[in-house]
């Protein structure tokens, strides 16, 4: 029955005349207020949306949105980790402005989001699935690792990444929770279609294509398993899956080496292992696309597609073994470049917009669609002027209202320094900590899209220019110092709360395999760090 539903959804859009779709999406709705559906995936590499159709993985519904809406070619996360990135999207503010430092410290539970604002202005609202923008979530291990990242020890904190196959060629529902939430969302859309008098905003958060938990890691397991079924894996032309180039371990930037080690990626991998991880990840992206398709199909079936804005994006990307890492927590393209597609009323089809944008821009965009006044003190800019700027299928020029730079920051686990990225005209500048204690990196994406050559030492004048601009946006040495103080305070509070059981608890976190080789030495390293005045 599930297989039949998927096939029916695909049939609807392969059989629906293209001119009918274009006409439906361009007509002004009778109700001046349009609906909005936002689908936010987790860990979706935005570069996949830039590829030719079916080149690496079959993504029919993303391609449908590309054809009938707008694709942002340069969309970036404001923090390559779950909770802070989502806090930026919901608040419209850079993470340092809300002190969203890690997966445990984000927005307060009563923080007014853009959805709260549109609800007060007459919209019916619904949030379903993964939201993950409030403080207090994620595992104990995750937060302790984030707090202690400045301690000078090196411990593996993640399971070794692996690829697992489940089910058979007819199994479509691998991520059961996502499918359950999509079923709830489609039922909600069907019910909303019966009420034509009140517009709605629907948010749906997916878990896919985030790696699955690795329960073999013990009590405090992380997520390092790329899991899919043969049904989705057949959507990936295996011969097209590439093996990324790696620098020798001894040549890696020190923060990259720390990340590779803590992510359990410094041991040898066979080409087969790497290719499987990447292929399975792409298959997980195909399943996420199928979930998006259920939402688009529901809007089409209920006659709401023509008066609904559909947004597809992600909190961050996935490295999938690029730069000898998996997961995110990095400013490399696989981790920081996110998908962003928008289609809906009055959006010209087939647009490819080159202006660099980020998640904070969705806050004012949602408010503008809702006809609500946009606050002046936010970090983002509405994307609506860009979306209505061009009526042809060529790349739309940059609009002066929106700056042509993006900023991202990271303060969580699996990286041993606060990290800041400035993207400006295809230059990517990455600064760390206080700007002096850790060397920066600079990449020319126009000639080095794989980011294998750090040219910071070759063009010092460009480094100086980019660093000056970054400091005009964020006083990053001051922010790094604040995070350092926060980490110490929170760790001390947690240690006091654990009491006499501290030694046992800290030894059994995700790093337990390494920790238990020299437990006393690691405890002493933490004690020395707590007492130090150095602000890294």
Swiss-Prot record:
Signal peptide start and end residues: 1-24
Binding-site positions, Ca(2+): 42, 82, 315-316
Organism: Xenopus laevis
Protein name as annotated: Arylsulfatase K
Residues carrying covalently attached carbohydrate according to the record: 195, 264, 377, 416, 501
UniProt KW keywords: Calcium, Glycoprotein, Hydrolase, Lysosome, Metal-binding, Secreted, Signal
Cellular compartments annotated: Secreted; Lysosome
GO molecular function: arylsulfatase activity; glucuronate-2-sulfatase activity; metal ion binding
High-level lineage: Eukaryota, Metazoa, Chordata, Craniata, Vertebrata
Entry function: Catalyzes the hydrolysis of pseudosubstrates such as p-nitrocatechol sulfate and p-nitrophenyl sulfate. Catalyzes the hydrolysis of the 2-sulfate groups of the 2-O-sulfo-D-glucuronate residues of chondroitin sulfate, heparin and heparitin sulfate. Acts selectively on 2-sulfoglucuronate and lacks activity against 2-sulfoiduronate.
């Amino acid at each position: 029955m599930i297989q039949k539903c998927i096939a029916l959804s695909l049939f609807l859009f392969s059989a629906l005349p293209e001119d009918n779709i274009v006409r439906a999406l361009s007509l002004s709705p009778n109700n001046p207020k349009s609906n909005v559906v936002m689908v936010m995936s987790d860990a979706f590499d935005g570069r996949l949306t830039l590829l030719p159709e079916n080149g690496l993985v079959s993504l029919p519904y993303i391609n449908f949105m590309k054809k009938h809406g707008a694709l942002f070619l340069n969309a970036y996360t404001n923090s390559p980790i779950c909770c802070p990135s989502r806090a930026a999207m919901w608040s419209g503010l850079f993470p340092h402005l809300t002190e969203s430092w890690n997966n445990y410290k984000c927005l307060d539970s009563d923080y007014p989001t853009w959805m709260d604002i549109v609800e007060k202005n007459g919209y019916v609202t619904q949030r379903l699935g993964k939201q993950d923008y409030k403080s207090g979530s994620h595992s104990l291990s995750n937060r302790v690792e984030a707090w202690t990242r400045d301690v000078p020890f090196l411990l593996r904190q993640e399971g070794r990444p692996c690829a697992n196959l489940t089910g058979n060629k007819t199994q479509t529902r691998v991520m059961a929770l996502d499918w359950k939430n999509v079923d709830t969302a489609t039922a909600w859309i069907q019910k909303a279609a019966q009420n034509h008098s009140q517009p709605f905003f629907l948010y749906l958060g997916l878990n896919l294509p985030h790696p699955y938990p690795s329960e073999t890691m013990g009590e405090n397991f992380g997520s390092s398993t790329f899991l899919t079924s043969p049904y989705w894996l057949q959507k990936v032309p295996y011969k097209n899956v590439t093996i990324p180039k790696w620098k020798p371990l001894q040549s890696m930037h020190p923060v990259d080496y720390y990340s590779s080690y803590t992510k359990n990626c410094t041991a040898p991998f066979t080409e087969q292992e790497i290719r499987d991880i990447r292929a399975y990840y792409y298959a997980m992206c195909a399943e996420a696309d199928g979930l998006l398709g259920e939402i688009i199909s529901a809007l089409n079936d209920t006659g709401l597609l023509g008066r609904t804005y559909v947004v597809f994006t992600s909190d961050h990307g996935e490295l999938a073994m690029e730069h000898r890492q998996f997961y995110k927590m990095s400013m490399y393209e696989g981790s920081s470049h996110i998908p962003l597609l928008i289609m809906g009323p009055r959006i010209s089809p087939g647009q490819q917009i080159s202006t660099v944008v980020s998640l904070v821009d969705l806050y004012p965009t949602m408010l503008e669609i809702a006809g609500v006044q946009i606050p002046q003190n936010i970090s983002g800019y509405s994307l609506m002027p860009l979306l209505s700027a061009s009526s042809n299928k060529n790349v739309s020029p940059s609009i002066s209202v929106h700056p042509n730079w993006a900023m991202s920051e990271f303060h969580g686990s699996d990286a041993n320094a606060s990290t800041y990225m400035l993207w400006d005209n295809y230059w990517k500048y990455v600064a760390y900590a206080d700007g002096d204690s850790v060397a920066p990196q600079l990449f020319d994406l126009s000639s080095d899209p794989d980011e294998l050559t750090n040219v910071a030492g070759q063009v010092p004048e460009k480094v100086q220019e980019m660093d000056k601009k970054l400091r005009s946006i964020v006083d990053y040495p001051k922010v790094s110092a604040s995070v350092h103080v926060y980490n110490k305070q929170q760790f001390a509070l947690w240690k006091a709360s654990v009491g006499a059981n501290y030694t046992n608890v800290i030894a059994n976190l995700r790093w337990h395999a390494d920790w238990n080789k020299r437990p006393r030495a690691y405890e002493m390293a933490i004690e020395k760090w707590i007492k130090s005045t150095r602000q890294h």
